[in-house]
Amino acid sequence: MKITKIEKKKRLYLIEIDEAEHFYITEDTIVHFMLSKNKEILPEQLEEIKTFAQFSYGKNLALYYLSFKQRTEKEVKDYLIRHDINTTVISQILTQLKEEKWLDDSKYIDNILQQNLHSGDKGAFVLKQKLLQKGIESQLIEDMLKDFDFSSICIKTAQKLLKKYQSKLPKRALKDKLKQALTTKGFSYQEAQIALEDLDIENNSENEEELIYKELDKQYRKYSKKYENYELRQRLTQSLARKGFAFDAIKNALREYL
């Protein structure tokens, strides 16, 4: 069989065999096999050319995908599958990309940890879930997370949360809110507890008084339409207690309010 045409088509070349069969190849394929018009090739050579062409095309696709940002092995694999690259060829491409240091899931995890250390606010649990979603093996993630100290990140995050909620919640509710927010961000209960102990959460009687009367106004409008006297007082007491106010503060506020 003979190559009867080689025609450039944007980033690929269209090759024609015996004026009948057509398929696309990369420039690397032309160079590798020294292909040219009228060159005679054997059937087994044709299959080798096709396989190499898909490998070359797939690797170029992967490198293009990696040029935008760091990716995991699973992300690159899925990208190549979406572009109809043969699964056997994909395995070969991934192997070569790892050998050439274009792909490294361990380095990917380390970069995520360093970014989180310097500018993030997530604990180990949330980071693990995000890394799992990227297709990284659970054992590799756990091996790299187990020796990483999240305490400084937890304390820094707790300080930011304190500034956000301190003027909005009474002390008891504030501690519960901070602990809940920290565990939601992926920190362990122990890390959250240590971070809260490190914070300087002071009693602010003026702020708490302002908060309790503000909440009392709100709850009174809600319950006074349905209840009165003892039942109303009970409803207000229960509602304010759920908001984290101390019973002594609630009793004093109700004495003046009602």
From Swiss-Prot:
Protein name: Regulatory protein RecX
GO cellular component terms, semicolon-separated: cytoplasm
Pfam families on file: RecX_HTH1, RecX_HTH3
Organism per entry: Streptococcus mutans serotype c (strain ATCC 700610 / UA159)
Domain of life: Bacteria
Lineage: Bacteria, Bacillati, Bacillota, Bacilli, Lactobacillales
Family: Belongs to the RecX family.
Gene Ontology BP annotations: regulation of DNA repair
Purpose: Modulates RecA activity.
Cell compartment(s), UniProt: Cytoplasm
Keywords associated with the record: Cytoplasm
